[in-house]
Regions:
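Conserved N-terminal beta1-alpha1 strand-loop-helix module at the mouth
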Residues: 1-95, 126-132, 140-147
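Alpha/beta catalytic cores of nucleotide-metabolism and tRNA/nucleoside-modifying enzymes
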Residues: 1-3, 21-23, 172-233
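Glycine-rich phosphate-binding active-site loops on the catalytic face of alpha/beta enzymes
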Residues: 19-21, 43, 72-77, 96-110, ...
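Active-site-adjacent beta->alpha loops and helix N-cap segments on the catalytic face
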Residues: 28-29, 50-69, 80-87, 105-123, ...
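Residue-level detector of anion-binding/catalytic polar loops
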Residues: 47-48, 67, 99-100, 131, ...
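Catalytic cores of alpha/beta
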Residues: 78-93, 137-149, 184, 188, ...
């Protein structure tokens, strides 16, 4: 797909995050589960998929004809960065054909000392035709990432960094601020649990939105039900 085709495909739509980490119930060594989630999402009208690991991305692209936002989650000593942290992971994601490559775009440094903006600039220099999304937490980091060449900025890390501790719900004001001030296209992601919140995120100015836990993580979904029930006993 061309960049314009990808933009037209995902604009105003739902991108479903299909991920299972090793400690989660839907994880298997062989894979095969996340492609089924992606098929269900596609059948339900999703406009794209967000996926983690080359294995899952490759399997998903074999069964759905939707743009894929690809990441590789990996912990590194000495840094809180864990979403597509090094150029090695970038190389792997580009090689497997991700449509949009997502990286963590917060204020911490990568293991080699690079800022998020420096890392994105290096990606764009190496892969000038690759669409890049920065998973951000605040306006300063989003603007820096967009200035470095990020095509999309996501609200993915809002509430998950020391600078944004205590934000445990969708920050519609932040989405609106990004839409006003940031030149990159805004992807609302994180803390979106209901269709009503999804619609409100689009009204706030999001170009598109990503939902994962409320759709593809049954343990989280069930936990919300049981917590609500137990609170009313």
């Amino acid at each position: 797909m061309t960049h314009e085709q990808i933009f037209n495909q995902i604009k105003g739509g739902l991108i479903v995050s299909c991920q299972a980490l090793e400690h989660e119930p839907l994880y298997t060594k062989e894979g095969g589960v996340m492609p089924l989630m992606a098929k269900a999402a596609a059948q339900s009208g999703a406009v794209g998929i967000r996926a983690n690991t080359v294995r899952d991305i490759t399997q998903i692209k074999q069964v759905v004809d939707l743009p894929v936002i690809g990441i590789i989650k990996k912990d590194y000593p000495g840094t809180p960065m864990y979403i597509t942290v090094t150029m090695q992971e970038v190389d792997e994601l580009v090689a497997c054909g991700v449509d949009i490559l997502a990286v963590q775009g917060t204020g911490a440094l990568r293991p080699n000392g690079q800022t998020s903006a420096e890392f994105i600039r290096a990606i764009k220099e190496k892969y000038p035709d690759q669409l890049v999304m920065a998973d951000c937490d605040n306006i300063e980091n989003a603007l820096a990432c967009a200035g470095a060449g990020a095509d999309f900025v996501g609200t993915t890390m809002r509430g998950y960094t020391p600078e944004t501790t205590g934000i445990n719900d969708v920050d519609f004001g932040f989405i609106a601020q990004l839409a006003r001030e940031c030149p990159a296209k805004v992807i609302a992601e994180g803390h979106i649990h209901t269709p009503e919140q999804a619609v409100q995120a689009l009204y706030a100015g999001a170009f598109a939105l990503v939902v994962g836990g409320a759709i593809t993580r049954p343990a989280e979904i069930a936990a919300r039900y049981t917590a609500a029930i137990n609170n009313h006993k």
